[in-house]
């Protein structure tokens, strides 16, 4: 057992020192642990995103910045990283302080998952004018075209956001899915059928009667609809029919 980082009181306020929102991946024989860090006095105790690495799970390397801003009121957070077929890497994050307002979802692309801080932050701006905000998650699937598909979820809206051009700024589209908005939805490319994406949602932040919904959608299905969705309410499983708009087909299971 090893301890990577220790923080203070877990409130999103400057002058406190929490660490949170971890994400891990393996890269070139090292385990890379990303997290949001509010302990840096040189950052006037504002939040930034960092990583540390280990080869033995006992000893951890120095803290390396992944996203930081000079303005201490800015709060980048919720790092998620995926590899693209070109060998590049994509990082998505929520950004309080964004010109778009709220916690707009931004991304960075780098040729190494260890050098995101050297790359510019880019807002996800779908062609339909929608605004993804908060607690993003991303995966890459080989389905959907010669470049595959980058799939991004956010915490405030029901759709997924797709990019079939390796992250080009002007190539984001919106896909309506049966899964409801949730804090925070996780995505998984199904290994036996990479055209299918699993969405796992645990309900809203602070909810008193939340549900857990698992939905699968097909990136290559035209004009699909949701087949089934479910949730557990007061200990009882409830099921119903649902519909999704646009490209994609989905079904859900609740517990």
Task: Annotate the PLM regions.
Residues 224-255:
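Glycine- and aromatic-enriched low-complexity segments, predominantly in secreted/extracellular proteins
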């Amino acid at each position: 057992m090893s301890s990577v980082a220790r923080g203070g009181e877990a409130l999103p306020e400057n002058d406190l020192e929490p660490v949170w929102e971890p994400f891990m991946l393996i890269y070139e024989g090292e385990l890379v642990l990303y997290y949001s860090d509010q302990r840096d006095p040189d950052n006037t105790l504002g939040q930034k995103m960092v990583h540390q690495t280990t080869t033995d799970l006992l000893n951890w390397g120095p803290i390396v910045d992944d996203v930081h801003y000079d303005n201490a009121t800015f709060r980048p957070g919720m790092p998620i990283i995926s590899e693209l077929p070109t060998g590049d890497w994509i990082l998505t994050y929520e950004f309080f302080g964004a010109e778009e307002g709220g916690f707009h979802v931004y991304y960075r692309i780098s040729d190494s998952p260890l050098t995101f801080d050297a790359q510019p932050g880019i807002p996800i701006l779908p062609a339909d004018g929608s605004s993804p905000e908060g607690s993003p998650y991303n995966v890459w699937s080989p389905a959907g075209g010669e470049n595959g598909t980058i799939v991004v979820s956010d915490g405030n809206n029901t759709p997924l956001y797709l990019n079939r051009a390796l992250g080009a700024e002007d190539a984001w589209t919106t896909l309506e899915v049966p899964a409801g908005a949730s804090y925070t939805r996780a995505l998984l490319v199904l290994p036996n059928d990479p055209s299918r994406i699993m969405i796992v949602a645990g309900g809203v932040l602070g909810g008193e009667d939340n549900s857990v919904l698992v939905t699968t959608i097909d990136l290559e299905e035209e004009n699909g609809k949701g087949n089934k969705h479910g949730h557990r309410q007061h200990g009882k499983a409830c099921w119903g029919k649902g519909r999704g708009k646009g490209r994609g087909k989905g079904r859900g299971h609740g517990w």
